Swiss-Prot record:
Subunit and interaction comment: NDH is composed of at least 16 different subunits, 5 of which are encoded in the nucleus.
Organism encoding this protein: Nicotiana sylvestris (Wood tobacco)
EC number(s) given by UniProt: 7.1.1.-
Source superkingdom: Eukaryota
Keyword Protein biosynthesis: no
Principal location class: plastid
Transmembrane segments: 9-29, 40-60, 89-109, 125-145, 147-167, 185-205, 219-239, 258-278, 286-306, 327-347, 354-374, 396-416, 425-445, 543-563, 602-622, 717-737
Record-given protein name: NAD(P)H-quinone oxidoreductase subunit 5, chloroplastic
InterPro entries xrefs: NADH_UbQ_OxRdtase_chlpt_su5_C, NADHpl_OxRdtase_5_subgr, ND/Mrp_TM, NU5C-like, Proton_antipo_N
PANTHER family tied to this protein: NADH-UBIQUINONE OXIDOREDUCTASE CHAIN 5 (PTHR42829:SF2)
One Pfam family cited in the UniProt record for this chain: Proton_antipo_N
GO molecular function terms attached to this record: NADH dehydrogenase (ubiquinone) activity; quinone binding
One cellular-component annotation, GO: chloroplast thylakoid membrane
Length: 740
């Protein structure tokens, strides 16, 4: 077994040849490299599959032996300082390696079809393979220096992938926003690393934890400085995992291709922050203020992400805010010390969210044949609806991911989220109330996304593009400004946007694309006729990864269920994490009280079903046909209560649609303040600093010109003036010093 561990250092480097060979091929033999581009995709999948098999084998060995393995190479610079490079294989490493490889393989297979007609196909696969290399290097690092190096490489890859379509100004701005926001956290991470090295004299995790715990036990450290260093370390995780207040880059990151969104939100970039906090938890747990800060940031992010998802019209942005909220649950669990629950939710959420993003990509792909190749249109849920008849496989798998994220048993996220909710009662009742309420919000906004996308009729066929008439045919409201601001019935859609899809603009479909015959029909609507096509199901290359992730969503939660209660009541996950849990808690109780579990499960599932019911009441098409019934009319009647209710709804909508005004606050005060400071600095430099320098020159020029006109050109006059000035100077000097 030890021989197997000795070769674990190769894990990050196995996918690396693909980006290197693609880059060299495009530089030296561009035509030949592009002609064999499918071969590069196959190699990317093959190499990552090798890493996956190796990671699974290491995980099985760890489950059976419950051991760590660390290997270090030392580069001695002098007698007082040396750089150590190595790798650490422990339960956290093996979990993250399996997540990265399994999700990464599914995304690569999916991308082969999704990016088939993109000119940047090879560049995309080069970035993806390098992204996997960077993340695998991060999770296998044995010290903080390696962590920081691969941390920056992960940030670089995310910058390249978010701005993959860099010719679009929106995508270029999004990748810059992500890069700059993460620079704030990365700078804090670097300062924190240097601070703890100054305290302990080591970058290695095992030595760092041992030395620091001894210093704390003997009260030999400055707690204020230690707390500051810990906060700086945590700032890196806050930025990378999109936690409040450095979350603003996450929704804009949706400007990249959809497979990138799946990888970033499931197993790579946003998971890196959770991984860092989990890795450094032995360091943080002896600093109570930091643990409380982690839990506070987590619970704020949980609620904020859920509220911001309520009014999103873009399907990918809605899922992005959902990711933000679920990451908040993980951070809350880590802050409470629930190490196992946090990693369990990291696993279950990764597969569920990858399923949802790839499913949304399939939906977007199908909508592009109708509304054109524009993200603002193909991702707009207001133009969707009724897709269950056209994309049934995507509908079923998307529903699985939605139910899992809502916490409906027996799907994956039910088991992990329920543990976090139960632990929150023991930690803080206030945090528990917020966490449980947010579980209901999660069910509401996730089913809102599902219903707007799949239920009812296809909205793109019934849009009133002229904006002169109301369109009551299809009455699911998107809860947008057009519906809410005018105090119209919540279940009626008004279209006042002057957007033309079929009347004025034609969107040709690539002839080299899918050669599929689709039914066309002519729909007469408000005295105008147009020819419409319907969405279609994606190809098998895209459906296969979605199907596999659906299976993961169904069954991955079983690793945390204690089936065998004899002799310790350990489930697979607890046995897997036993070395890490024992390191954190010497006397860990892994037993499960099934009665308590059932009570809490009934409550959490009831809250989830309540959120689903509210979403169904507001967005399911069956209620749109009840517009004349007394129940619906009671909501529409005007009156003081109705006006107050409209104000509340408008306020919630504005809060959610405007991203809680946090972006506006940063733009006005932070960006505006920096620009104001820059303008003041520019003014001071040009007017004051340069003014003093230029002023001396101007004065010298004026004095010189004045003297030039005084002089008459006679040397005798110059000598007379010179002697006169010297005589006056000597006289003054004599008078001053003779009196002393």
């Amino acid at each position: 077994m030890e021989q197997t561990y000795e070769y674990a250092w190769i894990i990050p480097f196995i996918p690396l040849p693909v980006p290197m060979l693609i880059g060299a091929g495009l530089f030296l033999f561009p035509t030949a490299t592009k002609s064999f581009r499918r071969m590069w995709a196959f190699q990317s999948v093959l190499l990552l599959s090798i890493v996956m098999v190796f990671s699974i084998y290491l995980s099985i060995q760890q489950i059976n032996s419950s051991s760590f393995y660390q290997y270090v190479w030392s580069w001695i610079i002098n007698n007082d300082f040396s750089l150590d490079f190595g790798y650490l294989i422990d339960p956290l490493t093996s979990i993250m390696s399996i997540l990265i490889t399994t999700v990464g393989i599914m995304v690569l297979i999916y991308s082969d079809n999704y990016m088939a007609h993109d000119q940047g196909y090879l560049r995309f696969f080069a970035y993806m393979s390098f992204f996997s290399t960077s993340m695998l290097g991060l999770v296998t690092s044995s010290n903080l220096i390696q962590i920081y190096i691969f941390w920056e490489l992960v940030g670089l890859c995310s910058y390249l992938l978010i701005g993959f379509w860099f010719t679009r100004p929106v995508a270029a701005n999004a990748c810059q926003k992500a890069f700059v926001t993460n620079r704030v956290g990365d700078f804090g991470l670097l300062l924190g690393i240097l601070g703890f090295y100054w305290i302990t004299g080591s970058f290695e995790f095992r030595d760092l934890f041992e030395i620091f715990n001894n210093l704390i036990y003997n009260n030999e450290v400055d707690f204020l400085f230690v707390t500051l260093c810990a906060v700086l370390l945590f700032a890196g995780a806050v930025a990378k995992s999109a936690q409040f207040p450095l979350h603003v880059w996450l929704p804009d990151a949706m400007e990249g291709p959809t497979p990138i969104s799946a990888l970033i939100h499931a197993a790579t970039m946003v998971a890196a922050g959770i991984f860092l906090v989990a890795r450094l938890l032995p360091l943080f747990r002896v600093i109570p203020y930091i643990m409380y800060l982690i839990s506070v940031i987590g619970i704020i992010t949980v609620l904020l992400g859920a509220t911001l998802a309520l009014a999103q019209k873009d399907i990918k942005r809605g899922l992005a805010y959902s990711t933000m909220s679920q990451l908040g649950y993980m951070m809350l669990a880590l802050g409470m010390g629930s190490y196992r629950s946090a990693l369990f939710h990291l696993i279950t959420h990764a597969y569920s969210k990858a399923l949802l993003f790839l499913g949304s990509g399939s939906i977007i792909h199908s909508m592009e044949t109708i509304v054109g190749y524009s993200p603002a249109k193909s991702q707009n849920m207001g133009l969707m609806g009724g897709l269950r008849k056209h994309v049934p496989i995507s509908k079923i798998t998307f529903l699985l991911g939605t139910l899992s994220l809502c916490g409906i048993p027996p799907l994956a996220c039910f088991w992990s989220k329920d543990e976090i909710l139960n632990d929150s009662w023991l930690y803080s009742p206030i945090f528990a109330i917020i966490a449980w309420a947010t579980a209901g919000l999660t069910a509401f906004y996730m089913f809102r996304i599902y219903l707007l996308t799949f239920e009812g009729h296809l909205n793109a066929h019934f849009q009133n593009y002229g904006g002169k008439q109301k369109t009551p045919f299809y009455s699911i409201s998107l809860w947008g400004k057009n519906g809410v601001k005018k105090n119209s019935c919540l279940l009626t859609m008004n279209n006042n946007e002057s957007t033309y899809f079929f009347a004025k603009t034609k969107y040709p479909i690539d002839k080299n694309g899918r050669k599929m015959t689709r039914p066309f029909m002519t729909i007469a609507h408000f005295e105008h006729k147009a020819v419409y096509s319907y969405p279609y199901e994606s190809d098998n290359t895209m459906l296969f990864p979605i199907f596999v992730l659906g299976l993961f969503t169904l069954f991955v939660g079983s690793i945390g269920i204690p089936f065998n209660q004899e002799g310790g009541n350990l489930d697979i996950l607890s046995k897997w994490l036993a070395p890490s849990i024992n390191l954190l808690h010497q006397k860990s109780n892994n037993s499960m009280d099934w009665n308590e579990f059932l009570k809490d499960a009934v409550l959490s599932v009831s809250i989830a079903y309540f959120g689903i019911f509210i979403a169904s009441f507001l967005y399911k098409p069956i209620y749109s046909s009840l517009k004349n019934f007394e129940l619906i009319n009671s909501f529409v009647k005007k009156g003081p209560k109705r006006i107050l209710w409209d104000k509340i709804i408008n306020g919630i909508y504005d809060w959610s649609y405007n991203r809680a005004y946090i972006d506006a606050f940063y733009t006005r005060f932070l960006v505006g303040g920096i620009r104001g400071l820059a303008e003041f600095t520019h003014f001071f430099d040009r007017r004051v600093i340069d003014g003093m320098t230029n002023g001396v020159g101007v004065i010298s020029f004026i004095v010189g010109e004045g003297i030039k006109y005084i002089g008459g050109g006679r040397i005798s006059s110059y000598l007379f003036l010179y002697l006169a000035y010297v005589s006056i100077f000597l006289l003054v000097y004599y008078l001053l010093f003779s009196t002393l």
